[in-house]
Swiss-Prot record:
Cell location: Nucleus
Transmembrane segments: none
Biased composition (Low complexity): 1806-1818
Biased composition (Basic and acidic residues): 353-376, 391-400, 428-439, 1757-1769, 1819-1836, 1861-1890
Protein name listed in UniProt: Histone transcription regulator 3 homolog
The gene coding this protein: HIR3
Top-level taxon in the UniProt lineage: Eukaryota
Organism in which the protein naturally occurs: Yarrowia lipolytica (strain CLIB 122 / E 150)
């Protein structure tokens, strides 16, 4: 392949990963196979290539739709190449085997090749040569249109630059191949006689282009094909070839159905093959082209002789074979060749299925639904049925009966979805007799009897094999069930007295069932009696195919068998197929018979009349069925289906008119010959009247027609009865039927009002009409319509009467008269039992008894169902019924249940492997539904008898009721039917369990919710079983009903939320989906939402804090009236919130970010609980936890939100404070009250391990300390008021001070520690020690809490070492010794109290204490002085000595409230970026000599270091970063060992270029949220100082580049960046020995031309040199990088000065004195650039002042053209050339720099003549630069620190790198200023810019000059706590 498309070119989002991976593998495999096939094809290995292509086409991906968006383009390309090359391979194979093939075979193979090519062209049609090949092949075999289409694709191909049309219009040159294509297109158009196209201008143009061109020659690649041999023979010759052929119809069963099926299969097999004579494909399955088979023979064969229909049968070519040979076409194997017949019971007459046996086709179209819909789809009843015997019969009677009994049974019905044998009895084998069955276990009967026996109710045991002593209907029921067939199922399912669910059906159709009298169910009916023997004898005679069909039709339809005898539905379908293809000939023959003068026999005419009438009736029946189907299912059909229906309806109507005309013609001929055809004429009129009802004609007109027909019937044939047994939609023709139709039409208007869908609007009128019809006592009472309806009802069926009664009772129920409705249903139910127990029933014949029994059971099913539903919804209705009546009804229910136990036993004994009748599944489901309804109604009666509705039921009654429900449910569930009847029994059981609240009913509840809702939940003792029930959706009422049981299971094990099982959590989620949230439209809920919303946005005032801590705060909530109050009272929402919190915590423990969705869900759940139960402090505590976790999550991953005023962090923390305070407030209010839900209180105390007081203390401490600094206590803005003097702004609330917040924390911690309910907690002591430190408590109190924390703390928590309290002890002791609060000896004694103490045993005080720990270890840092943080790095600022004078707090600031007005930074200790400007009039403070360390102090400090190292070793996960940081602090502050301190801090920092973050430390578990970013700030500031001390330019520049974009990883990013820039630039100047103010000394002496020449020379020298970058060049690159990164972010003055200095130093080293050689006219005093004169003295403030330039010197000259000539060099000129130098040397700098600083920079002569390479400055030099520190301020002074420190930032403007010449000239004109004045103005501007920095950075930028002119840097930080 020329190109390869990657498999992952398209991303498939809709496919699963597995499916996508499978496709990719298939594509890869297909490509490999195709390459192998192509290789074999090229080498001529055709067989191997065919095999490979076959394997290729078996891959699924080849056959996918190329338009699928999920399909890779590679598939389309592979598919195109595969089909194209496979077609070419077939063409090559045809060329090699051409001599061995016949003409037909060659044509067939060419067709197959074209099919392959067409499949390829469907994918890609852009290959012109391929289209030309396709066109040539198509034209050869005569497919001219296809050939033309291919050529037109070439002509109009869009892949060409210019189409043929454009080329012709432009008169462009066409090559010979293109001309040949045009010639063929024109030629084909002429051959096809497409004159329309030929007359078009384009064809004229093409014809003119090819007019003089010679015809194209035949392509060489197909020259071996002769097109003349593929010319198709004419139709006439084709017909002749078929004459003399013979068709053998093989029949497996000697019956009419077998004959018709054999004929159909033979012809179907004949036309199934594509390859027939001479390549002609016969598409008409019945050869309607006129070809006749002259001889048709019938042949009886055995089943085994019938060949597989899939065997290939080739037709023989008559050219190669003799014509006299026959053509044998064998049929498919008949599905019904072996007829399985049910045993026909002697009691049931065949007549029962009259008018029903041929309903199969109609049922398939209509699909009528049963009254009781199937509730359990997986109940396993699919193959349940009685045992049957298999016999093969040879008579038509049995064959016909089988079809009547097994209508449309699917062939696979006997093997699909079989149910395993019942657990009660084992399944019986197919050959095992029923007599060998095991006896039925009477346990179920005994259990029920033990409960109902005390009420004198009987439920004796009944056995299927011992029913002789029972009532007659028991024996009848056994006979019906034992010999159950389709006639019984159909009868039972059809007998339903329930009202029609679809009342939109025309009333005439509803009343049709009423016209059928009850005797129709039991009337005898014959089966097909026409014997096929005579026809089979004639099969040996030769006849044509049409004659063969006519003989079948005449034999079957030439009499009245179709209307009076039951036919198999398959036979009727076959006859209709034959008639569909014979009706043109029949109609033509009848018409010819009428018009020609030939004399036909009377028998032939009468026979034709019978056939025509039968066909007319078949079409009429189909039209009626179609009318009803369209009426019922219109809403369920698509527009396309409706159009098809309309077309079908139109076709049927045309066919009906044709046959009606035929029947009328034949009737007239018969009357002319005086033939007796009265019956046929009456049949025709009756069917026509039935059709008129479907046309919705006027009722009066229809009634008149029926009355006229009644007169005609009385006159001509009063005793005539035509059953129409095979026409389910045509009523029986008899005088009674006519009378019934007339009565129906008389009362149609009356019943239309009853059955109308609008009848419910006037329920009173409907009741009155039904009462008049049903309850009329005399014939004269009522109006005329009522009398007519009453008369009609006397002859109507019992089912119809019951239907009217149901309508009346339902109307009572809907109108509120439920009591009357119940009485009516009870009377109906009582009458049903009397009907079975009377002597009249026993005296009936078996057929009548069975019919009445099934009808009674069907009616009882509807009656009991309605009673159970009404009484369950309204239990009080049974109270008005007498106890005796209830007892009678209960016994009646038990009697019917005993009867249904006969069915159960038979059902349990079935063999699932045996076939079952078609409708057995639906019938068995109806029996089981009946049983469910009976048990439901019986329980309601039994409960009424036991007074089960009383409020205070004894335990024995509750136990009895619960046990009955449990036993019955187990029995019903065993048969997978407990959820039948819309789950009425399961719903009743659930209601009773919830109502009675029995302690031992939990198992029953679990089983019921499993069956009803599909909820799979188990307890410790019971696991519900699968009853095969189909669950329904859980509703709100259901969830509220049994949520108490679920909550009890939750409260059972309250040790942890994680102990709640996963299935229980899933159930709670389902319950929440059903219950939902409180309704916001309810007044109480809406009010509480408003109160809660206002409360959570209120500020946290000191007044509210005090009231809450005293329990005196109240919120105006209302008592909820929401229906979900019961769930909330049970703790449902509260527990859900706890689960959501636990889920979030679990995600955090997995070292992954928690899902905020869980926290939001927790807030929602707790809010719902507060809306319903606002006084539950557990929910307030939970929602406070959720808000605090949201705050922590926002501060976990980014510091961005710390600098945003009124951010979501502050909002969530404020809500957490408010809710936490209210939780404590409610707890204090309820401390003496008994909890409303003790289980929830116990669960809450067990789950929420943390005390509320401890949580509140942590919440206040986190909100008060850094980095938040009390932002959540501040308001977003101030209030604006209008007073007497105008508008003014102030805060009207008293906000808490920092000291007050710390006092709240101390009080909460003290309560938590002293609480007896909570065990001692190490964190409480730990946090209180920190608060004591903030509140300036005594050292003994602080140490006491730390030591208690160590004593209580465990060694490990969750597998990790606990180091916090131990580190706290070391850090505080170090701080106390440094501040002089403890002596070294005292601190050393206290240090021994930590178990991690390691004693230092060295004797030398000067011993090095460097640590050789692994540099790759991950460690952290600590700085715990939040309260003293005043400057930008105040948390890292501590006094340098204990003797520092204290600062007296100002009275004005002490105790001042936190206010936005106090946002101005308060003067604090000197920091690293603080500008130290010493007043010129005040002398500098003399340096204090540091006191040497004593041996005890050295031992103490060294022991601290060893102890901290011990902690580092114990920290296996390297998460704790504060011990290494404290070690580094001790090295720096005590021993002044900067390199050891640096080695301790190096593992924290990423000094490699691969990492983007400058520092990397982990957050320990007990570290406050957001504190992590403060530590990053402290460590960076500290490490920058260490790098400056050790002259590490490489590390400081690397960190500087990473620091610029690290603004979201720390606090005060701008200050760290400014400090880093300042320190790095000072360091670069120092290591290169650049004197101060070098530019001021050099730039005035530079001449521009000379400077420009030297700068260019320096650049050329460096760029041309092959040596690596020099040290100065590398530093210049780093300085320029700092300048670039700082551009637009901060002030660039210092960085610009460094770049200028470094570049000037490079020029000096390069040019020496020549740099100033041409500047003699500008200065009277020469400037010396070498030796010691170039260096400045250490003590000097500035370099020696240069002589003033000569007054006569000019700054600029003029060129010849008059323009000014630039002579002066500015800083911008130097910056521009330095930038150009860096760009020119880009290959040597950047990533290519190899900067080595271990040996330091090159030695530079100092002022005293010595040189130094040391990387670390001396201690004495550092002491001169260290400022004195201020002591720690008190908490009162720091109250103002809670003012907002995060305000807007004002960015400084940035100077451009270069300006235009005009700006430079204007700058040069300022010659009156000296260089010193310019420098002073520049620094003044920078100071102004620094003062404009935002207050959010806490201090202005730290740039000033000291007394000695050097920028000082403070390295001191506060000691960690």
């Amino acid at each position: 392949m020329s190109s390869f498309i990657p498999l992952n070119a398209l991303e498939d989002y809709s496919l699963s990963s597995a499916e996508e991976h499978t496709r990719e593998l298939q594509i890869e495999e297909g490509l490999k196979i195709f390459q192998k096939a192509l290789h074999a094809q090229r080498q001529g290995k055709l067989d191997e290539a065919f095999d490979l292509y076959d394997a290729l086409f078996k891959i699924d991906v080849i056959h996918l739709d190329i338009d699928d968006n999920n399909l890779s383009p590679t598939v389309g390309r592979l598919k195109y190449l595969a089909y194209k090359n496979h077609g070419i391979l077939l063409l090559e194979h045809l060329a090699h085997n051409l001599d061995d093939l016949t003409t037909t075979e060659i044509r067939d193979q060419l067709q197959d090749i074209l099919v392959q090519f067409a499949d390829a062209l469907l994918v890609d049609d852009s290959d012109d040569s391929f289209l030309k090949l396709f066109s040539d092949l198509a034209r050869i075999i005569g497919l001219k249109r296809l050939s033309r289409f291919a050529l037109e694709c070439i002509v109009s191909s869009p892949s060409r630059v210019f189409t043929f049309s454009e080329s012709l219009l432009n008169h462009d040159f066409l090559n010979p191949e293109e001309v040949a294509i045009l010639q063929e297109v024109v030629l084909l158009a002429k051959q096809l006689q497409d004159y329309v196209s030929m007359d078009s201008p384009m064809y004229d143009l093409m014809a003119s282009q090819v007019a003089d061109v010679a015809p194209a020659k035949k392509p060489k690649y197909i020259s071996w094909i002769e097109p003349t041999q593929f010319k198709a023979p004419p139709l006439k010759d084709l017909k002749e070839t078929w004459r003399g052929s013979e068709l053998v119809v093989e029949i497996g069963v000697p019956s009419w159905r077998g004959i018709c099926k054999g004929l159909h299969d033979s012809l179907h097999r004949l036309t199934k093959r594509k390859k027939v004579l001479n390549g002609v494909t016969i598409r008409d399955p019945y050869l309607q082209i006129g070809v006749e088979i002259s001889s048709v023979h019938g042949k009886l064969v055995d089943e085994e002789d019938l060949e597989d229909p899939e065997d290939d049968v080739e037709m023989m070519d008559i050219i190669d074979k003799p014509a006299e040979e026959t053509i044998e076409v064998k049929t498919e194997e008949a599905l019904d060749s072996t007829v399985k017949v049910e045993e026909i019971p002697a009691e049931i007459n065949i007549g029962e299925v009259e008018n029903k046996s041929s309903t199969e086709e109609n049922k398939k179209q209509e699909s009528p639904e049963n009254g009781d819909k199937k509730e359990a789809s997986g109940n396993g009843n699919g193959s349940a049925g009685p045992p049957v015997k298999d016999t093969t019969v040879k008579t038509e009677d049995r064959d016909s009966l089988t079809v009547a009994l097994a209508i449309k049974r699917p062939a696979e019905g006997t093997t699909s979805s079989s149910q395993p044998p019942s657990k009660r009895t084992r399944g019986r084998g197919a050959d095992e007799p029923a007599e060998l069955e095991k006896q039925v276990d009477p346990g179920f009967f005994n259990n029920i009897t033990s409960f109902v026996g005390s009420l004198d109710l009987k439920f004796p045991f009944v056995d299927l094999n011992q029913l002789d002593n029972e009532e007659q209907f028991y024996q009848d029921f056994k006979a019906v069930i034992s010999n159950w067939g389709e006639q019984g199922s159909e009868l039972f399912l059809k007998l339903s007295s329930a009202p029609e669910s679809n009342l939109s059906v025309p009333v005439t159709q509803i009343l049709d069932s009423a016209a059928q009298v009850d005797d129709d169910y039991g009337a005898p009916c014959n089966v097909l009696s026409i014997s096929p023997d005579k026809f089979l004898e004639q099969m040996s005679e030769s006849c044509s195919l049409s004659d063969f069909r006519f003989k079948i039709i005449e034999a079957l339809l030439g009499n009245s068998s179709l209307v009076n005898e039951i036919w198999p539905s398959e036979l009727i379908a076959s006859v209709q197929i034959i008639l569909n293809h014979l009706e043109p000939q029949i109609l033509r023959d009848v018409r010819q018979m009428f018009f020609d003068g030939q004399t036909h026999s009377d028998s032939l005419i009468k026979q034709q009349l019978y056939v025509a009438e039968a066909r007319y009736e078949l079409v009429a029946n189909e039209i009626i069925a179609d009318k009803q189907r369209i009426t019922e299912n219109t809403s369920k059909l698509t527009k396309s289906a409706l159009r098809d229906r309309e077309w079908h309806k139109k076709t049927l109507h045309q066919r009906l008119l044709a046959w009606e005309s035929c029947v009328i013609t034949l009737l007239s001929m018969c009357k002319t010959r005086q033939l007796s055809v009265t019956e046929l004429e009456l049949r025709h009129t009756w069917v026509r009247l039935s059709l008129s009802q479907c046309d919705e004609a006027e009722i009066s007109r229809m009634r008149q027609n029926y009355e006229e027909f009644q007169v005609q019937l009385l006159d001509e044939a009063p005793d005539l009865m035509v059953r129409f047994v095979n026409f389910p939609h045509i009523q029986t023709l008899s005088l009674d039927s006519v009378n019934g139709q007339i009565s129906k039409l008389k009362v149609a208007s009356t019943f239309a009002k009853i059955f109308s869908p609008d009848a419910d609007e006037d329920i009173g009128t409907r009741i009155a009409m039904l009462e008049s019809i049903l309850k009329g006592s005399s014939d004269t009472s009522g109006d005329r319509e009522s009398l007519s309806a009453r008369e009609f009802l006397q002859h109507a069926s019992i089912d119809f009467k019951h239907k009217l009664w149901y309508l009346l009772l339902d109307a009572y129920n809907e109108s509120g008269e439920k009591r009357i409705s119940v009485d009516g249903y009870i009377e109906m139910l009582t009458s049903l039992s009397y009907e079975l127990e009377t002597a009249g029933y026993r005296n009936m014949n078996p057929n009548q008894r069975h019919t009445i029994l099934l009808r009674t059971l069907s009616t009882m099913n509807d009656t009991v169902g309605n009673l159970a539903k009404i009484c369950r919804d309204t239990p009080a209705l049974l109270e008005s019924v007498s106890r005796e009546k209830i007892h009678e009804l209960a016994q009646l229910c038990l009697s019917f249940l005993r009867l249904l136990q006969v069915f159960n036993q038979f059902y349990d004994r079935r063999n699932p492997e045996e076939p079952t009748p078609f409708l057995w599944d639906k019938a068995s489901e109806k029996f089981q539904t009946m049983m469910v309804k009976l048990w439901t109604f019986f329980y309601l009666l039994f409960r009424q008898l036991t007074n089960g509705l009383d409020e205070n039921l004894p335990q024995t009654t509750i136990s009895t009721l619960n046990d009955i429900l449990s036993i019955v449910h187990e029995d019903l569930g065993h048969r997978k039917c407990c959820s039948f009847a819309n789950g009425i029994f399961v719903d009743l059981t659930l209601d009773e369990i919830v109502r009675m609240k029995w302690n031992e009913s939990e198992a029953d509840l679990l089983q019921n919710i499993r069956c009803r809702f599909g909820i799979q939940l188990a307890n410790e003792h019971y696991h519900p079983t699968d009853h095969g029930a189909t669950p329904r959706a859980l509703k709100r009422s259901d969830g509220l009903a049994f949520q108490d049981f679920i909550m009890n299971m939750v409260y059972r094990k309250p040790s942890s939320v994680h102990n709640i099982r996963a299935d229980l959590r899933a159930v709670m989620d389902q319950l929440y989906e059903a219950i939902g949230d409180p309704d916001k439209n309810i007044a109480s809920t809406s009010h509480n939402m408003t109160v809660l919303g206002r409360f959570t946005v209120a500020p946290v005032t000191w007044n509210y804090i005090e009231n809450s801590l005293r329990g005196e705060s109240f919120l105006p909530f209302m008592t909820s009236t929401d229906p979900v109050l019961s769930a909330s009272t049970g703790g449902f929402y509260c527990v859900q919130g706890m689960l959501a919190l636990a889920k979030f915590r679990q995600g955090k423990k997995a070292a992954a970010p928690g899902r905020t969705e869980d926290l939001q869900a927790a807030v929602k759940f707790f809010t719902n609980d507060i809306l319903c139960c606002p006084t539950r402090y557990e929910s307030w505590f939970g929602i406070a936890n959720a808000y605090e976790m949201l705050t922590e999550d926002d501060l976990m991953w980014s510091a961005e939100k710390l600098d945003v005023p009124n951010s979501i962090v502050n909002i969530n923390q404020r809500k957490a404070l408010l809710c936490g305070l209210n939780s404590v407030n409610l707890m204090l209010q309820q401390r003496d009250e008994k909890p409303a839900n003790p289980q929830l209180r116990t669960f809450f105390n067990a789950v929420m391990k943390e005390s509320q007081w401890l949580f509140l203390s942590k919440l206040f401490y986190s909100a008060t300390a850094n980095p938040l600094h009390g932002a959540s206590f501040r308001q977003a803005d101030n209030k604006i008021f209008c007073g007497m003097k105008g508008l003014y702004m102030r805060q009207n609330l008293s906000l808490p001070r920092r000291k007050q917040c710390y006092q709240v924390v101390r009080a909460c911690l003290t309560i938590s520690i002293n609480s007896k309910d909570q065990p001692p907690d190490w964190y409480s002591y730990y946090l209180r020690s920190k608060v004591y430190s903030k509140l300036k408590k005594t050292t003994q109190a602080i140490l006491g809490d730390i030591q208690k924390s160590i004593a209580v703390a465990p060694d490990k928590i969750n597998g990790d070492i606990l180091l916090e309290p131990h580190y706290k002890l070391v850090a505080y002791l170090y701080k106390a010794v440094k501040r002089g609060k403890l002596t070294a000896a005292e601190a050393y004694k206290e240090l021994k109290k930590t178990p991690h103490f390691v004693e230092y045993l060295g004797e030398d005080a000067d011993m090095e204490s460097g640590d050789d720990s692994d540099s790759d270890s991950e460690v952290g840092s600590d700085s715990e002085t939040e309260s003293t943080k005043e400057g930008p790095i105040a948390s890292a600022t501590e006094p340098a000595a204990d003797t520092a004078p204290p600062v007296v707090p100002s009275e004005g600031t002490s105790g001042s409230p936190i206010s936005i007005d106090d946002a101005t930074p308060v003067p604090g200790p000197v920091t690293a970026v603080t500008a130290i400007a010493a007043p010129p009039t005040v002398a500098a403070k003399p340096e204090e000599k540091k006191k040497p360390l004593t041996r005890m102090e050295i031992k103490f400090y060294k022991s601290c270091i060893e102890t901290l190292r011990r902690m580092k070793v114990l920290d296996k996960r390297k998460w704790h970063h504060r011990p290494p940081f404290l070690i580094a602090r001790i090295h720096k502050e005590v021993f002044e060992d900067y390199r050891s301190a640096k080695e301790e801090m190096v593992p924290f920092f990423n000094l490699k270029n691969q990492s983007k973050a400058p520092v990397h430390i982990w957050k320990p578990d007990f570290e406050r949220a957001g504190k992590h970013f403060q530590y990053v700030f402290d460590y960076l500031m500290f490490f920058i100082v260490l790098l400056d001390k050790t002259d590490d330019t490489d590390a400081i520049t690397t960190i500087g580049k990473k620091l610029r974009r690290f603004n979201n990883g720390m606090v005060n990013h701008f200050e760290v960046w400014e400090f880093t820039c300042l320190t790095s630039n000072v360091l670069m100047k120092r290591v290169t020995r650049i004197p101060e103010k070098l530019p001021d000394a050099i730039i005035p002496s530079l001449q521009f031309d000379n400077f420009d020449r030297i700068a260019q020379g320096l650049q050329d020298k460096i760029t041309k040199s092959k040596e690596p970058a020099s040290y100065l060049l590398s530093l210049l690159y780093y300085a320029s990088e700092f300048r670039r990164l700082n551009n637009g972010f901060g002030s660039t003055g210092v960085v610009d000065d460094t770049v200028v200095c470094l570049y000037l130093k490079m020029l000096i080293e390069y040019a020496g004195t020549s740099l100033l050689a041409d500047n003699k006219s500008r200065s009277s005093t020469p400037v010396v650039l070498d030796g010691a004169k170039f260096e400045f003295q250490p003590g000097s403030a500035q370099p020696p002042a240069l002589p003033a330039p000569a007054t006569t010197a000019t700054t600029a000259g003029k060129k010849e053209d008059g323009k000014k000539e630039k002579t002066r060099v500015t800083r911008k000129d130097i910056l521009l050339r330095a930038t150009n130098l860096i760009k020119a040397c880009s290959n040597k700098v950047g990533e290519n720099i190899k900067l080595v600083t271990t040996k330091g920079p090159p030695a530079v002569a100092s002022s005293n003549g010595s040189s130094s390479n040391s990387g670390t400055r001396s201690n004495s030099e550092e002491k001169e630069k260290e400022p004195t520190e201020e002591p720690e301020k008190s908490t009162q002074d720091s109250d103002v620190e809670m003012a907002d420190a995060n305000q807007g930032n004002t960015e400084t403007t940035v100077e451009p790198e270069a300006e235009g010449e005009a700006d430079k000239s204007a700058e040069e004109d300022k010659s009156d200023k000296s260089a010193e004045e310019e420098k002073t103005d520049k620094f003044a501007e920078e100071e102004k810019s620094a003062s404009a920095e935002p207050a959010g950075k806490n201090t202005p930028k730290s740039k000033s000059t000291g007394s000695n002119g050097v920028i000082t840097i403070d390295e001191e930080y506060s000691a960690p706590e």
